[in-house]
Amino acid sequence: MSGSKREAALTGQPKDERKKSGGGVINRLKARRVQGKESGTSDQSSVTPFREEELLGLNQLRPEHVLGLSRVTENYLCKPEDNIYGIDFTRFKIRDLETGTVLFEISKPCSEQEEEEEESTHLDASAGRFVRYQFTPAFLRLRKVGATVEFTVGDKPVKSFRMIERHYFRDHILKSFDFDFGFCIPNSRNTCEHMYEFPQLSEELIRQMTENPYETRSDSFYFVDNKLIMHNKADYAYNGGH
């Protein structure tokens, strides 16, 4: 799966007004850069290469560090407590933009449910940082896909919120998105939809990705003011229905 363009609509409004309509200003944003071998736009010549082992030894990671990675990470490059801004992703939806069909949707439980779950179970420190997706092979042939994400912000203002998302198949990079959320006000609920336009994948690559579930993986790195504060992971299978 590879991408050639990504756009977003970002809406921010205070949490206590999230049920009201018309409370936020909508900004339409574009990714600063998209890379991907399938799209013919992969140019790493100006990027300094880094190994994961090198980055694990650093106290502070910046965007140029993760852009220099040539393979998916095996470890998390920051701790959950590094998210000092209280950024919390509460809803995620993937849809086919051409038909409007919802392909995947997940929402975080409400506060009351979370409290009950925390009392009854011991949560792993990495809970919520990893997602596993399963799609049918037809997903790899979609041309336009929208990914809607909703997140809340804590008491601190978030300056220059940025996400770098890198997708790999068998440790070969498929695509890399570099996306600016911009400024988020304190105690706000924000929604954005990333609109991906995918070029046509080769039949051989589609076959390999379908026959090898969960060997397609991704790293999502989140930065505030150029400092890494969150790192999420995902893996993907495209053999649904088989």
UniProtKB/Swiss-Prot annotation:
Keywords: Cilium biogenesis/degradation, Lipid-binding, Protein transport, Transport. One of its GO terms (molecular function) is lipid binding. Residues 38-48 have a biased composition (Polar residues). One of its GO terms (biological process) is lipoprotein transport. Residues 1-20 have a biased composition (Basic and acidic residues). It comes from the Eukaryota. Belongs to the PDE6D/unc-119 family. Adopts an immunoglobulin-like beta-sandwich fold forming a hydrophobic cavity that captures N-terminally myristoylated target peptides. Phe residues within the hydrophobic beta sandwich are required for myristate binding. PANTHER family: PROTEIN UNC-119 HOMOLOG B (PTHR12951:SF3), RETINAL PROTEIN 4 (PTHR12951). Myristoyl-binding protein that acts as a cargo adapter: specifically binds the myristoyl moiety of a subset of N-terminally myristoylated proteins and is required for their localization. Plays a key role in localization of proteins to the primary cilium membrane. This is Protein unc-119 homolog B-A. It comes from Xenopus laevis (African clawed frog).
